[in-house]
Amino acid sequence: MISIDPLTQLNNRNRMEQHLFECVRSQDLNMYLLVLDVNRFKKINDEHGHAQGDLALKAIANCLKESCIEKSDFIARYGGDEFVIVYKGNDVKGLCQRIHAYIKKLSFPFDLDVSIGWAPYHKDIHKWNDWFIEADKQLYNEKKKLKDR
C-alpha cells in the first residue's frame, strides 16, 4: 500500500493512522499529537489559484520536515490543508512557536499561517482516534479564536 502523499512527500493518512495505532499501543507517555490546519486556505485557492495553494502546502511540508521536528518525530499530511505531527519532545509550546516562526518566513504573495491544536498522550487513551479527537478539539478552539479577532 502506498504510504506517501504525492504532493508533499510526507506520510499519508493511511500511514498516519497506522502510526497512531502503534503509538497508542506503545503507551509511551512522552508523546504529543499536533493537528495543523492552514488558515484561510480556501481564500488562498480562490484568490491566487490552486497552483499557489499547492506550492504553499509543499512549502509548509518542507518547513515541518527540515526545520521543526526531530528525526524521532512523525509527520503526515492528513488531507487537504491539514497536517499531523507526533512529537516526542517535552516542549510542545516551543515547537508550536517554532512552526509559526518558520512559516512566517516563507515568501508568498499572501499571508500564510497555520492553527495548531495539540494533545498529550495519556493512559486514558485506548484508541488512536480518541487522541486525534482531543487534538482536533484544540485545533477547533484555535480556529475559533482566529475568527473572533
Placement of each model-derived feature along the sequence:
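Short, conserved catalytic or interaction motifs in soluble domains
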Residues: 46, 88, 144
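Conserved nucleotide-binding and Mg2+-coordinating catalytic segments in signaling enzymes
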Residues: 1-18, 36-50, 58
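Short regulatory alpha-helical coupling segments
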Residues: 11-30, 61-69
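GGDEF/GGEEF active-site signature
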Residues: 59-124
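Active-site-flanking beta-strand signature of metal-NTP-handling nucleotidyl enzymes
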Residues: 32-37, 75
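Cytosolic nucleotide-binding catalytic cores of signal-transduction proteins
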Residues: 28, 55, 63, 77, ...
